[in-house]
């Protein structure tokens, strides 16, 4: 950690509730608020403890953290993530900390863990610790601004919610295949059919790609579900879903087709040149889409539908760390997320690797994996020589910078803390 080169990095305001402002940070970097307890004896100072990281995209900004109890000293540190810095990737990995499992027990106790088209849900799971519960091929997880994690659990035909106390609750679906009503109905009374796409707003409103029924459904903060639209052509494959906050624009995946829906124009194909789409995100005014079947990642112009290759050679091997993303095999790539400072996190299904592609297009191995491996809980996430993940389904980022990953046929949701470890 170092002072931003050539600047006077400083805290400009700090209140007791943890609202902090700063100036002269890196315009592409991370700021870390650290604290140290005031000494009880003269000269007996303790260690500086990282409290909160913030991505920085401007020299001056602000954020909020929870101050520790008691009298404290505070300081602000900064690192550069720009590709002009030779330490950019090192700075990124050192800004992340511990790997956790937050949901799933690997279908423990079942003779056929991780089997496709198998519903492992039991009524007794309701309200239990999420790490004691068997998931059924979960496909995507995303967090709201209150730190609740929503999971679309494909083969239990439901959406599950892990609350901040670590317990799991059904928030949509009846845990069996059905085609529930389209009008306003309590979400836990509405049957769905292999839902596998999800989009969550900060206030806890969420949207579900009810793939088997060819529908996009909404659940409001009162737990009421309505169908926004039904695709008359049906939805094949599914997975990718993105919803604008005013609900007037929705993009979703259907096999080879990337589709757009608006209230006035209905459903149209934006691009039909894919093999087997995975997840999608918005990047500026354009879309980024993964093609699991072609092992590639594309930028799609939302006005014309024209696509441009971003990452992937189409090969079926493992990635080569530190080399151009365009020349790399991204075997079964299906997850994608963009951090505030640019670049992309990509999650490979068959390759079982989580990678980061920096803004210069260089690929870096972030977390290694293999088949159905699952390891590393409670440890620093960056262990490239060890397999910590199984096959990956998705990656997303919450509003605090933590990474949420769905991995392994046997059903786990993991989190990597955006929290620097103490030195």
Model-based region annotation:
Residues 89-137, 167-194, 223-240, 264-278, ...:
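Gly/Pro-rich loop segments of beta-rich domains
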